[in-house]
Amino acid sequence: MVALDVLGITDSDAPVYRQKQEADTLVLGTIHPFRKAHRSVLGKLAQEFRLVTSDRRSWKILLFGVLNVVCTGCLLMWCSSTNSMALTAYTYLTIFDLFSLITCLLSLWVTMKKPSQIYSFGFQRFEVLAVFSSTVLVQLGSLFILKESVERFVEQPEVHTGRLLVGTFVALFFNLLTLLSVKNKPFVFVSEAASTSWLQEHVADLSRSLCGLIPALSSFLLPRMNPFVLINLAGAFALGITYMLIEINNYNAMDTASAVAIALMTFGTMYPMSVYSGKVLLQTTPSHVIGQLDKLLREVSTLDGVLEVRNEHFWTIGFGSLAGSVHVRIRRDADEQMVLAHVWNRLSALVSALTVHVFKDEWSRASLSSGVLPSAPLSLSEYVTAAAVFPAAPSRAQGSEPTPATSTPAKPSSPPPEFSFHTPGRHVQPVVFQTAHPHRPLYGGLQGPGVRLGLGPRGPTLQAYRTLSAAPHTYTSGTYTGPPRP
């Protein structure tokens, strides 16, 4: 699309070049004959890939990724030649290593990116999504192995052991080399934070029993073992037993049994990690952090000037990073910046992305009476007598008229105070009851000396209201028309 320029000639014959933009605005600037083309998705991916490869740490990850693809291709060909389902299940662990390398590369990209307007908390959730996707895909592969193994139990084919043992050692060597050479922070954190799998628990029980006989092995066996290393060793052990039984007794069904065992161990190892990463994606609060957060919130509520801590919400935005928002209500005379600094100092040690809303107390309590109110309501005749004896309340200037909620004068232009109830009667005309007694409006002040009517000591003039239930007479605002007063 060509952008047109409008040439305007002023009175001084000075040319002014203006470029018409998309928003229909004319601005001064350089003429661009063609609009800048938008990049495609592949172009954006290529740009981000060049950004990652600019760091030398990614070269090692890319090298292991290429070796993984070559090794996985060789293992899949050997699985086809040997017709071994157990070796196929073990090859899926190599494919999982490829997913872990991609996750590691994505983690490096996240550290290089800065938060944007769309992703204000950063791109850490991409790591969580990568871990969740990898573990779920491996579990789906395990279910596929279980389905194929059930079909093989009906009709067991012959298994060739020519490259079975070679493929086992090649896969074990490459898997351990990848796990121990490349530091994968997301999977390391998940393996430590997630709950232990049933395979880890059984191995821990065997390790305790063995360490009771040989105490020297306690430093090696008693600590919590890496679940990825454990599943690789257990799978290689199952393949070794399968090779021996097929070679010695030609027991081909052992291959299917080993495939089922490897699939179950893989599913049991990946399931706790997928659950943990799924909870992070759901923005939940980790269970091991709830107690610490409660303790910190109690400390914040005891700070000087803090009246209330409410609407607290904390969630995980990534592995090891916690975000939160809290509302703090403080006194009117408290220093907002000082309270904010103290709250931030207490919570920032645990919550990396913290939002604190500090607002001052705006509650105002209406004081409608300065004396002691009567225990029983007054009758209508008592109101009439009081209105006849005492004169009306002296009028105040408009600028100094008290409000129902506060005792301070309010300006004519100021709005009514917050939480003040718009009680009727302040600007109402005097009300006359159609009875034989003299009447005065209900808002008359009690200023007469010596008479209190059960309202306590005489106080300043203010509005006093009582509720009249089922009054026998109607009342209007006008001239008295009843019988003559006595």
From Swiss-Prot:
InterPro entries: Cation_efflux (IPR002524), Cation_efflux_TMD_sf (IPR027469), CDF_SLC30A (IPR052005). Its main location: Golgi. Residues 82-91, 147-161, 249-255 are extracellular. GO terms for biological process: zinc ion import into Golgi lumen; zinc ion transport. The chain crosses the membrane at residues 61-81, 92-112, 126-146, 162-182, 228-248, 256-276. The keyword Lipid biosynthesis does not apply. It comes from the Eukaryota. GO terms for molecular function: zinc ion transmembrane transporter activity. Residues 1-60, 113-125, 183-227, 277-486 are cytoplasmic. Residues 394-425 are annotated as: Disordered. It is a multi-pass membrane protein. It is found in: Golgi apparatus, trans-Golgi network membrane. One of its GO terms (cellular component) is Golgi apparatus. Keywords: Golgi apparatus, Ion transport, Membrane, Transmembrane, Transmembrane helix, Transport, Zinc, Zinc transport. Gene3D superfamilies: Cation efflux protein transmembrane domain. Residues 394-411 have a biased composition (Low complexity). Has probably no intrinsic transporter activity but together with SLC30A5 forms a functional zinc ion:proton antiporter heterodimer, mediating zinc entry into the lumen of organelles along the secretory pathway. As part of that zinc ion:proton antiporter, contributes to zinc ion homeostasis within the early secretory pathway and regulates the activation and folding of enzymes like alkaline phosphatases and enzymes involved in phosphatidylinositol glycan anchor biosynthesis. Belongs to the cation diffusion facilitator (CDF) transporter (TC 2.A.4) family. SLC30A subfamily. PANTHER family: ZINC TRANSPORTER 6. Heterodimer with SLC30A5; form a functional zinc ion transmembrane transporter. This is Zinc transporter 6. It comes from Danio rerio (Zebrafish).
